[in-house]
Amino acid sequence: MPHSDELDSRDVLSVSGLNIAFHHEGQQVDAVRNVSLRLKRGETLAIVGESGSGKSVTALALMRLIEQSGANVRCGEMLLRRRNRQVIELSEQSDAQMRRVRGADIAMIFQEPMTSLNPVFTVGEQIAESIRLHQGASHEEALAEAKRMLDQVRIPESQAILSRYPHQLSGGMRQRVMIAMALSCRPAVLIADEPTTALDVTIQAQILQLIKVLQQEMSMGVIFITHDMGVVADIADRVLVMYQGEAVETGSVEQIFHAPTHPYTQTLLAAVPQLGAMRGHSLPRRFPLISADEPALYESQIEQDTVVEGEPILQVRGLVTRFPLRSGLFNRVTREVHAVENISFDLWPGETLSLVGESGSGKSTTGRALLRLVESRQGEIIFNGQRIDTLSAGKLQPLRRDIQCIFQDPYASLDPRQTVGYSIMEPLRIHGLGQGDAAAKRVAWLLERVGLRPEHAWRYPHEFSGGQRQRICIARALALNPKVIIADEAVSALDVSVRGQIINLLLDLQREMGIAYLFISHDMAVVERISHRVAVMYLGQIVEMGPRRAVFENPQHPYTRKLMAAVPVADPSRHRPRRVLLSDDIPSNIHKRGEETPAVSLQLVGPGHYVARPLQDNALSRL
């Protein structure tokens, strides 16, 4: 059925009166109510809102994937102008017709790449499949185009990456593969659902730049779904704010940021962590939390030095971690990934040391090495005066009580078949620290301590929001009264207000229990808020380390300054002219077997402030 008269000549997408409902226990539950939007060629529309606001559900409806989630479009119109200028009503298309439309005319980048990529096919085959299907290219032509797209999204060693599987890549690398796949067929409309949430700030800056460049080249309309208002300020032309399934405010990016009218929009903007907000403060500070009902209500600020002087609780000396890469007829080790190269640091009781850096910098591998989830090539890990890197699994078991972890994805960290009470109680049973009523009381206390109710113990993970699931993971980590918690991107995927709540909870627990945190993150504004000290990692090495105030207010290493410059600022008028976009290639940390990485020496430049002075042939010297 033709619809060309109903769509403006410049519009590529028009949605009117969209209503979406989920089926739950025999009833219809409205998820989206009366949402309307328009998207022009070459325009970027940002849809913002917290979890549960309906923004992702709206995107899935446009892709006609919502039916797979047990939902349906109750009413509304969704018109799309295809690349061949034909206008179609998306809800009228058959499944076979939609398979031809998806990818070629409307494409989507999802937030979680590991669940979007097929684990049994190589990266190259998955990108090439889309190119062959929609462009009619040969296998060789499709692989060549796949390599070119990987180069465009700034993946080093792109030829080698083509033959790797998703699990062999870091989270940031997998997200870049997803972006390359979505853009490979140059769609008329690109829907990006939190595409940069899992990426570090420098890669985020380049991905945003890449999307803008390709958008201009192809006159592509972009719907950018995010909760990061800094990203919105950087990329959006217009903004649609969603709250509880409804569009509560829409306007140009300047109108939304400088003259928001709805209380919820004002709440979103006030909750954004601002880099530089800690200037003049040496100690971590709680986030000022506000509510949509009372936008003027701020929590009080509490500053307290929690660091205990004396001996460090954790010492790392000369840690080296490498991963073998096999190739050839006999599957021999020919190259190695130099993930962590000769790093050393200390962590004191009650202190938060943050590890920051790009994807592939080695920060997560460092955390896993400390937990003995990966084995180190050399170096020493000393916990509470005892060397633990040489202990057997049996002797290490009692020490695991004192070192716990919180991972990025709380849903993947919890057993979906068990109640959350069972998951929280499990460490107590393993270590023989409680059973029966005593363990149940401990679980109830832990749930209350992280802001949940004791009766939540009988629920399953899927019955909670992302922020609630992360609180459950924190409760589980606290079950054994640990001395150190390694938090690996623990808040990066959470909404801004939920992120602030979790950070405040971690600070409260540190103040009450004296816990030391190794906080691994790429979110510089959050790192600035929670840290006592910061260590900046680049290609497996620490290039700058010192008190948080010194590193953030007076960064000495060029790589640290690049990280700072790449942080999005939630102000479109200030931000666009001063934006620093990086174009340097990331050197590869893959080396021939037996090849050594040139060492760097850390030199003292201020009280407790160290910066790397690279050797002339080191990649650091090119920054």
Curated annotation (Swiss-Prot):
<dbReference type="InterPro" id="IPR027417">
    <property type="entry name" value="P-loop_NTPase"/>
</dbReference>
<dbReference type="InterPro" id="IPR017871">
    <property type="entry name" value="ABC_transporter-like_CS"/>
</dbReference>
<feature type="domain" description="ABC transporter 1">
    <location>
        <begin position="15"/>
        <end position="269"/>
    </location>
</feature>
<keyword id="KW-0547">Nucleotide-binding</keyword>
<dbReference type="InterPro" id="IPR013563">
    <property type="entry name" value="Oligopep_ABC_C"/>
</dbReference>
<dbReference type="Pfam" id="PF08352">
    <property type="entry name" value="oligo_HPY"/>
</dbReference>
<dbReference type="GO" id="GO:0016887">
    <property type="term" value="F:ATP hydrolysis activity"/>
</dbReference>
<feature type="binding site">
    <location>
        <begin position="49"/>
        <end position="56"/>
    </location>
    <ligand>
        <name>ATP</name>
    </ligand>
</feature>
<keyword id="KW-0067">ATP-binding</keyword>
<keyword id="KW-0472">Membrane</keyword>
<keyword id="KW-0378">Hydrolase</keyword>
<dbReference type="GO" id="GO:0005886">
    <property type="term" value="C:plasma membrane"/>
</dbReference>
<dbReference type="Pfam" id="PF00005">
    <property type="entry name" value="ABC_tran"/>
</dbReference>
<dbReference type="InterPro" id="IPR003439">
    <property type="entry name" value="ABC_transporter-like_ATP-bd"/>
</dbReference>
<dbReference type="GO" id="GO:0055085">
    <property type="term" value="P:transmembrane transport"/>
</dbReference>
<keyword id="KW-1278">Translocase</keyword>
<feature type="binding site">
    <location>
        <begin position="357"/>
        <end position="364"/>
    </location>
    <ligand>
        <name>ATP</name>
    </ligand>
</feature>
<comment type="similarity">
    <text>Belongs to the ABC transporter superfamily. Glutathione importer (TC 3.A.1.5.11) family.</text>
</comment>
<dbReference type="GO" id="GO:0005524">
    <property type="term" value="F:ATP binding"/>
</dbReference>
<protein>
    <recommendedName>
        <fullName>Glutathione import ATP-binding protein GsiA</fullName>
        <ecNumber>7.4.2.10</ecNumber>
    </recommendedName>
</protein>
<comment type="subunit">
    <text>The complex is composed of two ATP-binding proteins (GsiA), two transmembrane proteins (GsiC and GsiD) and a solute-binding protein (GsiB).</text>
</comment>
<keyword id="KW-0677">Repeat</keyword>
<feature type="domain" description="ABC transporter 2">
    <location>
        <begin position="325"/>
        <end position="564"/>
    </location>
</feature>
<keyword id="KW-0997">Cell inner membrane</keyword>
<keyword id="KW-1003">Cell membrane</keyword>
<dbReference type="InterPro" id="IPR050319">
    <property type="entry name" value="ABC_transp_ATP-bind"/>
</dbReference>
<dbReference type="InterPro" id="IPR003593">
    <property type="entry name" value="AAA+_ATPase"/>
</dbReference>
<comment type="function">
    <text>Part of the ABC transporter complex GsiABCD involved in glutathione import. Responsible for energy coupling to the transport system.</text>
</comment>
<keyword id="KW-0813">Transport</keyword>
<dbReference type="GO" id="GO:0015833">
    <property type="term" value="P:peptide transport"/>
</dbReference>
